[in-house]
UniProtKB/Swiss-Prot annotation:
Gene Ontology MF term list: RNA binding; tRNA pseudouridine(38-40) synthase activity
Protein name: tRNA pseudouridine synthase A
Similarity comment: Belongs to the tRNA pseudouridine synthase TruA family.
HAMAP family according to UniProt: TruA
Amino acid sequence: MNNIKITIQYDGTDFYGWQIQPNLRTVQGEIYKAVQKVYGEKITIYGCGRTDAGVHALGQVANFRVPKMLVPINKVHIALNSYLDRDLRIIKAEEMPDSFNARASATFREYLYIVHNSSTSFPFYERYAWFYRKNVIDEKLINEYARYLIGEHNFTSFCSTEDENDSKFRYLERVKAIRKGDTIYFIIRGNAFLHNMVRIIVGTLVEGQKKKKPINFIEDILKSEDRAKAFVTAPAHGLYFRRAFFKDE
């Protein structure tokens, strides 16, 4: 079997998330149909991260296996894109060892969250950033709060109550807010994420600085292991799966 890794970008606005669902348009489902048309095979697609409805991707990664390389590897992305709509694109394809699995082989996943912090919203931000005008966001204070998220913690307080993972422990390597003009970019990198985890982290950091919470308030929320202690879930449309990191990379 030939193991093919693909890097994917998509505008998540008109998708019901990554994972295949009956009678719904999903990213995994659309790629599956394109692979079937190119290779004539029923295959399994393994994705690095499961994005929710409305969430975008700049560098999502997936892999699938096919018995024959009917298309040269440098043309695979072109062949697949011919069966995909314009809001979903395969950026590149690579042949990988059989041991590679986009989900299991990833050591870290990195998300980007964009907040437009202005008194006026702009049409081109509507689908791609959280418009926040309640106050001028203090990114320096946010970065002080964020220090308490680094490392391994029980993130029960920072995930949906519908999350089905047995363990809520996750490791975060980086949580950083960077301001460029009226736009704030949150970069959050971890080994894995719980349902709505990034969006709840961003919403809690933003609302925390608005309320002028003490520096260690994040620590108290983590210790509570109670979703009700954290703040709002930031909107899906500001979130992007930015990239994945793999072993030996």
